[in-house]
């Protein structure tokens, strides 16, 4: 991502006003943007995240900080920046989190820098108490889903209609993304399959212990894995139902699928085109 941004700005910085970046902790964003005299807009999900970015990097190039995008972990679609201490099933209201972010920014003399609220924004009338609010300070709002429903939007009409009929409980905040981050998406058959597949999952060790004391042999080479006694009966039942192929995950677990599904997964891993800097699904990493 850093190389792509650098090369893009080398060729087109005269027509680019600013760049935004999230999906992790983009420490190098400010350095690259400032080198070309371009504003940068980091995406964060908490005051804690911005504090780390500021102290490590952004304080050196504060003149080019155009704004801070607050992407709410529970309201925004796509990938979300939940920390290990936050419960994905217990949403927190955005106001106190943005107020905390503004308070921190004020400590760094960033009162003039706007916060851009992203996630759950549909109509400005729902956010009137945020506007001209001293606790929030300069604020702007990012519309993500609503523009998808316009006539100019190229997405299929069926998808536009689906977005207009989503009911409470039909959006899933899950951790199936190959990035390793939580992601929010409308529930569909694919997500249903992933949830069911996740339930057919057992931890394992390659060496026997008092807890992992049940041996199972996998594949033509009879590779030995050890699972908990409490999981052995589940595995026997899954195999009986046709989920006879175990596949290892980056989390040292076995997921049990059908032979057909296993073949499809392996093919998809082989066909990986490297769209991420690091992918937990295909084991691809740009640094390896």
Where are the model-predicted features located?
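Generic beta-sheet signal
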Residues: 43, 118, 143-144
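Active-site entrance/lid segments in N-terminal catalytic domains of soluble metabolic enzymes
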Residues: 1-110, 284, 288
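A short glycine-centered flexible hinge/capping loop motif at secondary-structure junctions
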Residues: 116-123
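Conserved active-site-proximal phosphate/metal-binding subdomains
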Residues: 75-92, 104-112, 124-288
């Amino acid at each position: 991502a850093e190389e792509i941004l650098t090369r893009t700005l080398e060729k087109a910085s005269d027509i680019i006003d600013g760049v935004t970046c999230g999906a992790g902790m983009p420490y190098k964003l400010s350095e690259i943007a400032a080198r070309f005299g371009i504003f940068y807009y980091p995406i964060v999900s908490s005051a804690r995240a911005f504090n780390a970015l500021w102290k490590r990097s952004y304080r050196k190039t504060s003149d080019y900080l155009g704004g801070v995008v607050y992407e709410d972990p529970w309201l925004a679609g796509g990938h979300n920046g939940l920390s290990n201490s936050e419960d994905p099933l217990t949403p927190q209201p955005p106001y106190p989190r943005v107020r905390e972010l503004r308070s921190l920014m004020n400590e760094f003399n960033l009162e003039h820098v706007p916060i851009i609220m992203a996630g759950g924004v549909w109509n400005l009338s729902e956010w009137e108490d945020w506007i001209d609010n001293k606790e929030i300070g300069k604020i702007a709002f990012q519309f993500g889903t609503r523009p998808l429903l316009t006539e100019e939007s190229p997405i299929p009409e069926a998808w536009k209609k689906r977005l207009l009929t989503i009911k409470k409980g039909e959006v899933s905040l899950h951790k199936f993304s190959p990035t390793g981050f939580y992601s929010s998406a409308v529930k569909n058959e694919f997500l249903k399959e992933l949830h069911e597949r996740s339930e057919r999952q057992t931890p394992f060790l390659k060496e026997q212990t008092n807890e992992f004391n049940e041996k199972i042999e996998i594949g033509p080479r009879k590779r030995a894995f050890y699972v908990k006694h409490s999981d052995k009966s589940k595995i026997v039942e899954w195999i009986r139902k046709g989920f006879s192929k175990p596949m290892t995950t980056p989390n040292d677990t076995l997921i049990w699928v059908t032979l057909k599904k296993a073949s499809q997964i392996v093919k998809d891993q082989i066909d990986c085109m490297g769209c991420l800097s690091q992918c937990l699904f295909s084991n691809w990493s740009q640094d390896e």
